[in-house]
Amino acid sequence: MPEIALVVGLGRSGVSVARHLHERGARVLALDDTPDDQVRAHATRLGIDLVEAPDLAALTALVNEADVIVPSPGVPLAHPVFELASAHGVPVRGEVELAFRWTELPLVAVTGTNGKTTVTALIAEMLTASEVPAVAGGNIGLPLSDAVRRDVEVVVAEVSSFQLWFTDTFRPKVGVWLNVAEDHLDWHGHVDSYAAAKARIWAHQLKGDLAVANADDPVVSRYATDAPARVETFGLVEPADWRVVDGVLVGPPGEVIAVSELRRSLPHDVANALAASAAALAAGGTLAG
């Protein structure tokens, strides 16, 4: 546990991680360039020091004082705190990374440009229907550092490219990568950087873990060939482990559900259901669930 943590940005995840760091005995410093009264109230309630829009000298002093820097997902990479952290050898770890380190619960993580909120919710619903207590969190609403404290057996996390960028040991038991399209290039600069950030969902998995990959997305498929975990694919066009046969969703364990029984059955809905089924079964769900 770091003795002094600098949390950059007191949004939803920033407040959550600041609270948990404080409860774990760290001295928490908070930096916010555009604080409002709510941000100030959060800092006061948490009993942490809030520094508002520091100049470069003050920011340098803060970085030098910190043992770790924890940026909120919306902080741009161009923010000088990152260059200073690199120059002064201070590690940068996101809330998702810290939450992973704080729990022994198995994690199912979902990323992708489109569909990740839907698939995250679907997996949690499938597990619950299978009588496996689960909670959805991460980018979906409940910060991951809060979700891992729930009385559940599995945590299902929506994780963005921003959140994955600042991970260095994050290892979901099941990592689902849905797709890649050009997005957030103002933050990443190039689609290759964006895809590389997404690929970190699989980077630290082990052979006993599962990588769920979209066979119809060439970028995802390319990265899947280097995934250290076991890979299961899903798709509607290319050959895949999870697919539709005669109007029925099927996977290695057998038939799941008829397309006609899905609440929504557009192609992307079917693909989402395939991905969610693969992940939920790997996390302890049942075909009935």
Predicted regions and their residues:
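Beta-strand->loop->alpha-helix junctions that form or flank phosphate-binding loops
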Residues: 32, 51-54, 93-97, 135-137, ...
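Adenine nucleotide phosphate-binding catalytic loops in nucleotide-utilizing enzymes
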Residues: 3, 8-10, 44, 62-63, ...
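N-terminal leader/targeting and accessory segments in enzymes
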Residues: 1-94, 98, 265, 285-288
